[in-house]
Design a protein with these regions (language model features):
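Generic preference for well-ordered secondary structure
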Residues: 2, 6, 14-18, 50, ...
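Short, positively charged, Gly/Tyr-enriched micro-motifs
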Residues: 63, 70-150
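General helical secondary-structure elements
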Residues: 41, 120-122, 193
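N-terminal juxtadomain amphipathic helix
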Residues: 15-66
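Generic structural signal for short, flexible, solvent-exposed coil/loop and linker residues
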Residues: 7, 11, 20, 53-55, ...
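Helix-boundary capping/turn motifs
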Residues: 3-9, 68-69, 100-101
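Long C-terminal interaction/binding lobes of large macromolecular proteins
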Residues: 1-12, 23, 27, 127-128, ...
């Protein structure tokens, strides 16, 4: 299942450019809370499992801050490189957990050697994918766009298998695109039940 292209600079440049495009569109749409102008407020993250990535590709999180007085809220767009607040890169979380779903021990050991992911971490990821992810608002809505039901006990491998492509790189990219809204805090309904303004 593992493909060396996963660690290629070409693959990670593709992810970075996609995030750049999302960020540009987010800024053009203005603040989703008040409609104010957004100013660049990028910040650095230091995710693990960034094999093959250059510093900027791995660490730069595109983000904006509203310039309108009285709002000043942060707007962080969706991302294919980051999966919410998880310490490891989104690609690593998806791929390594999918390996574990298949019990492909040799492949998993190879991934662990590359990314330094311990067994306990992988087990936590499996629990998240199979017990918590299916209960998210995102999945409740997004699974309706899939042509056939996904076997949730095999997530994320079953989701990765759903997307077609010539190699693992293209299938993984399609999966990460599908999951982008998991990394968009402002998209989620807040604890008071209020949704951000959409323009």
């Amino acid at each position: 299942m593992f493909d060396s292209s996963f660690g290629s600079s070409k693959f990670h440049k593709l992810l970075f450019r996609f995030d750049q495009d999302i960020a540009s569109k987010t800024r053009a749409d203005k603040c989703p809370y008040c409609g104010g102008k957004l100013h660049v407020g990028n910040y650095l993250r230091h995710p693990r499992g960034t094999y093959g990535m250059e510093h900027e590709q791995a660490n730069l999180r595109f983000s904006f801050c509203c310039g309108r007085e009285g709002c000043r809220r942060r707007v962080t767009p969706p991302s294919v490189r980051f999966l919410g607040r998880k310490v490891y890169s989104g690609a690593t979380v998806v791929l390594v957990t999918a390996m574990r779903c298949r019990d492909a021990k040799q492949a998993l050991n190879r991934i662990k050697a590359l990314f330094g992911v311990g067994n306990r971490t992988v087990q936590r990821w499996r629990i998240w994918w199979q017990q918590y992810f299916p209960k998210t608002i995102f999945w409740t809505i997004a699974k309706g766009y899939l042509s056939e039901p996904i076997q949730e006990t095999s997530l994320p491998a079953s989701l990765l298998d759903r997307f077609q492509g010539a190699n693992l790189e293209s299938r993984l990219f399609a999966t990460l695109r599908f999951l982008t809204m998991l990394s968009a805090p402002y998209f989620k309904i807040n604890h008071r039940g209020a949704s951000p303004r959409r323009t």
